[in-house]
Every structure is written in structure tokens, then in C-alpha cells.
Amino acid sequence: MKVSAAALCVILTTAALCVPASASPYASDTTPCCFAYISRALPRTHIKEYFYTSSKCSNLAVVFVTRKNRQVCANPEKKWVREYINSLEMS
């Protein structure tokens, strides 16, 4: 009986030590991923902010947020996208 109680204690201690150090699950990252980019430039006056997609996404993208809170995916390699980002950073 003492052997099985000791074995159970060892198993529970081992299991507790094997828990990952990070308590936050991957699902807590709410940044959207983009699977396609907008084909043409948006009017600059419609954009209020931007952010980059998570590094966990398969495609790197810039997400522009419009004045109507619509999120639009754009290719960060396009010249107009870089210009819009620079403009938003300056303001």
C-alpha cells in the first residue's frame, strides 16, 4: 500500500513539473491572419490605423483598419502600402 501511494505521489509530482511554462494558450492571440491581399490601393483618407499580422500566420501582411472599422489585408511589399505606413507613422 505504501509503495502504491509513493508511486502515485511521484507520478503526480512529475506530471505537475511537465506542465508548460507558458500558461497562455496560442488561441489567446486574436490577431487575424490574411490569406489574400487587396488588389488595388485604398483611398488614404479611409484608413485610420494599421497593424501587422502575427508571426504565427503563414502570410505576412499589413492589416489596414478603415474609418468604418473594416479590416483590409495588404501586401507589405507593395509601394503604396509602405507609403501609407510611413504616412500613418508621421501623423
UniProtKB/Swiss-Prot annotation:
SMART domains: SCY. GO terms for cellular component: cytoplasm; extracellular space. Residues 1-23 form the signal peptide. It is found in: Secreted. GO terms for molecular function: CCR1 chemokine receptor binding; CCR5 chemokine receptor binding; chemoattractant activity; chemokine activity; chemokine receptor antagonist activity; phosphatidylinositol-4,5-bisphosphate phospholipase C activity; phospholipase activator activity; protein homodimerization activity. Disulfide bonds join C33-C57, C34-C73. SUPFAM superfamilies: Interleukin 8-like chemokines. GO terms for biological process: antimicrobial humoral immune response mediated by antimicrobial peptide; calcium ion transport; cell-cell signaling; cellular response to fibroblast growth factor stimulus; cellular response to interleukin-1; cellular response to tumor necrosis factor; cellular response to type II interferon; cellular response to virus. InterPro entries: Chemokine_b/g/d, Chemokine_CC_CS, Chemokine_IL8-like_dom, Interleukin_8-like_sf. Its main location: secreted. It comes from the Eukaryota. This is C-C motif chemokine 5.
